[in-house]
Amino acid sequence: MSEANFNLVLHPEARFAAEDFHNRLQIPFIELRRLYQTDKIASQYQAFGKVLGVTFSDEVYREKAEETVAKFKEKRPDASFAIGECMNGDPFEMALAMIKYGFKVPEIYGTLTAENFIYLNQLSQLSPETKVFSNMEPTMLYYDPEKSGVNMTIGKDAGYYHPDQPNVIWNQDRQPYGYAGVTR
């Protein structure tokens, strides 16, 4: 990282290292968020391309990602997700993506930060019945999933709260980015 013209930050945990290099070595950084909304992924790639002075041709990848979502929706039209924060991404952004794709998200397990409020605002408008739970809350030890309506979970923590539902842990070391995150 210390010999680069700029650093590319793909995970928020790397931001502090990039800021340190910027402050100590005057190496700028660009942060790209892990997103699951295909329109936002496309916008982010376009903005990144402008910074680099290139054009990305991502239509094929976007179409594939949107086809993957459509196929899953066709196969599981009743999918109702609990999304946790112990996964590769922001649970609020992923929940917003799932709702925009036409799925239900009755529950989100996550820690609210200033970065999440843009998603929370949209979620409250599109899915006011979605509940947000904090993993830090001691009473979560007594959480009862019986009446949640959840039939699928994403994130290790969501799987913990719903042990009888299918779970995608989604927190491996190899973390898909961009459209690959949608298709996998």
Range-by-range predicted roles:
Residues 1-184:
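An N-terminal assembly and electron-transfer interface module characteristic of large anaerobic redox
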